[in-house]
Swiss-Prot record:
GO terms for molecular function: hydroxyacylglutathione hydrolase activity; metal ion binding. Zn(2+) 2 binds at residues 64-65, 137, 175. Belongs to the metallo-beta-lactamase superfamily. Glyoxalase II family. Keywords: Hydrolase, Metal-binding, Zinc. It comes from the Bacteria. Signal peptide: none annotated. This is Hydroxyacylglutathione hydrolase. GO terms for biological process: methylglyoxal catabolic process to D-lactate via S-lactoyl-glutathione. The gene is gloB. Monomer. Thiolesterase that catalyzes the hydrolysis of S-D-lactoyl-glutathione to form glutathione and D-lactic acid. Its EC number is 3.1.2.6. The lineage of its organism: Bacteria, Pseudomonadati, Pseudomonadota, Gammaproteobacteria, Alteromonadales.
Amino acid sequence: MLHITPLAAFNDNYIWVFQSQQNTGAESSGIYVVDPGDGQVVIDYLIQTGQALLGILITHHHHDHTGGIEQLIRRFGAQIAVYGPQSENIIGVNHPIVANGDISLTNAGLNAKVIQLPGHTLGHIAYLIEDVLFCGDTLFSAGCGRIFEGSAEQMYQSLSELGQLPDNTKVCCAHEYTIANLAFANRVEPNNAALIDYTKKAQALRAQNLPTLPSSIGQEKAINPFLRSDSEEICQSLSIQFQQPINNPLQSFSLLRQWKDNF
């Protein structure tokens, strides 16, 4: 079993901390962190909890996901394993990942499945550990990342691949964008009962300054327009907004992303 904790950073980032938790309930003596954009946030957590840093996982090269790597290496030593996509030439990555497959986090007793997700950036990857997905800026709750380097088709395929994961897969996104994403989702699919219910729950959480994450793949398939581009209501909304017929899910997805970029 995996124990996960989101650490808030900057305005809306989450640095995810995880460690194995044995059947007895005793946790491992150290943690991994995902996308430490701010090293001090991680250091403060380690001091507070008395944990050791076992390693770092990086999903893509953007500075708000990588900015803390060098500080953490200076503090805890160059032996710290830092995994990340080889193609993105990220300073501090000493275990470059070149393809889909498994990596063994032996010091934590865990295996991670690497999933290539081009779109937000060309080299973007996600890590699936047990039933927990660390997906960076590809999939958000009720939304998806902007397409900075890849194509709409690449992003569509990446999200489609994530949509094939089991419904109970926990989704650990890197940003607390949920409320803003839900405003758009309700605009394009206003009669989605699951979306209406989820919006109320998310608003209640944020009113208490609590994270809306992790979500789940099943939840996102029910409420996220970017995983629902074949929805009849979404296609009708797009047809009205763009004054054109919607012929296929990729076209629908591309127009959704275009609309959201200017929403």
